């Protein structure tokens, strides 16, 4: 039940909340269903205000009851009931669609569970490892190359689900045309070594590199390096505990503010989400995902052509605010609260990370976080305007 900060949630809460989602929206679709415990609507609802009030996120760590044993029993009970209805073929088509959404929702929380555990263990003075057996891979980074892309009018986004086959969140739709001016994208994400140069050059002390709110946050919280880098300059905290930092691996746990400041220092900028998605179109979704079981960004062998590590390793901050696409329509009913109401004061990230399930990601996937969020596996790929 450890909760290391207001933005994180205890592992027990993640387990209960994802189970509650199936109970509330799948089993609860039957008017005759009686909930496991009506009070849990309050405890494990996250933000669905149309259902009713929810226990405040900063206080989730105070929920000593129900116990972990009770939560695990709850997961077993609800899972058994859902599986029985699925096997019996008694679920309505609309409920089956919600079941699919529930599986996608569970995958999102699998990643959040890992990032929240990592933050909690880092806050522990002992620096415990979540997985002491995690292997590390050290390979020399490819030279950073600039890949020129011509101006084009193309399409981004996804066809609305479930009207069209293939799951996509409502914030990914509708598919629409965009004009993308000529630009260049970096061949790979920024490495730890490159980010260390930014620090050594006074990047965290140079106000002119920072957005105003970013500089204020940097000063208020005394940011001097990425979240999990040790002050000794050589180590970083991982889910395997404190480890020597691989200079060639993608830098991670950056806020939007830090990513933007680095880009300015490098004479570049962050890519727009349209630039990113058009570059990703047709690129195979392979990379270092949670399925790889590294649970940390990895350096890869040099490659001569193409974009490297576009998927997996680190979510890549874009310079695009999280806003609705033209013609956006949220899902109907309570599930309309899933994405649309958060379309303010957040920024889009793309590509997935080492904590993302491989089959959860796609080129059109829009992750989003506030500009000061640092505890996710977020890094940066640079872009430049073409002359």
Segments (PLM) and residue ranges:
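Functional-site microenvironments in short loops/helix caps that host divalent-cation chemistry
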Residues: 102, 106-108, 112, 116, ...
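Alpha-helical, largely C-terminal catalytic domains
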Residues: 82, 86
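Disulfide-stabilized, aromatic/cysteine-rich ligand-recognition loop
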Residues: 1-9, 13-21, 25-81, 96-111, ...
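A conserved hydrophobic secondary-structure block that centers on an alpha-helix together
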Residues: 89-97
